[in-house]
Amino acid sequence: IFVFGYMMFGGANAMIYTNAIQAVIMLVVAIILLGSGAHFFEGGISWFWEKIASIDPNLTKNFNQTSPLFRDWFEVIFCNFVIGIAIVCQPHIITRSLMLEKGASLNKFLLYTIIVETIFFFVLFVGFYARIEFPDLTADGQAIKMDGIMSMYVVKNFSNFTGLIIIVGLISAGLSTLEGLIQSVSTTITSDLIRPMLYGDKSDDETLQRKLKNVNRIVIIVLAVIAIFWSNQQLANPKLSVGILAQNGVYAFFAAAFVPVLQGIFLKNVPRIAPMAASITAIIVHFSVYYGQLTPYTTGEVRNPAVAGTIA
């Protein structure tokens, strides 16, 4: 509610400042988490991987046949490659460069992005740290839920103060993405769907802009209600991880926005029906593949949203 609230009234201006604060916190937390497992490498890299392999040999393999998400090259490499291309074309990613005050800052922006993103990628190793700490994924005889493993690792290895900072950093990672999605989804719905239906080709003026701003705020409220409902469903009926729930919706959005964004960047005078048809088709295909269990990768209790998104 807090995030939806300040995005509703602050918009992109608020997001610039909150994202900057969140990014600094996340970077500090990433370094703390990576450093927390330094002692696992005292015997060298080979000892570290041997320790991981002794817990579960599948953890050191390229693919894991027993996993519902990492079974073969198609899931691990191809799907992630396609989704990666779609991600960099998303409105909430592209608009980051538009927030630069000067065009000359673009190269510096890209350099910082690559450095920080590389550090964030290495945070995946913290999952190995947690698995070494909890080899059988239990604590005090109780099974640890998938979404609670990192929290348990933080509680066990850090003081209350440091643990609080880390938890704030983990929350910031979700909030920064949520802000971008709120901005891009609400703007897309308002500008590309509602405006053409209600106002046609009416030229921009102060009155119309004010009306669209109010419409956008209503859209954000509706999105908040939907988000609260789905979050409650995940809490009541968890399916492996909240990450699966998030990926299912986000990848559907990625698929829907991919073609329209590319057309907007590289083509001129595109018929309105073209991006609309592409978006509608992508959404229908994504959810049909996922919920209709149309492939071997999207059957069973846990299904891979990346496969549905790739096909869409």
Question: Where are the regions a protein language model picked out?
Answer:
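Membrane-embedded helix-loop-helix hairpins and adjacent transmembrane boundary segments
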Residues: I1-A312
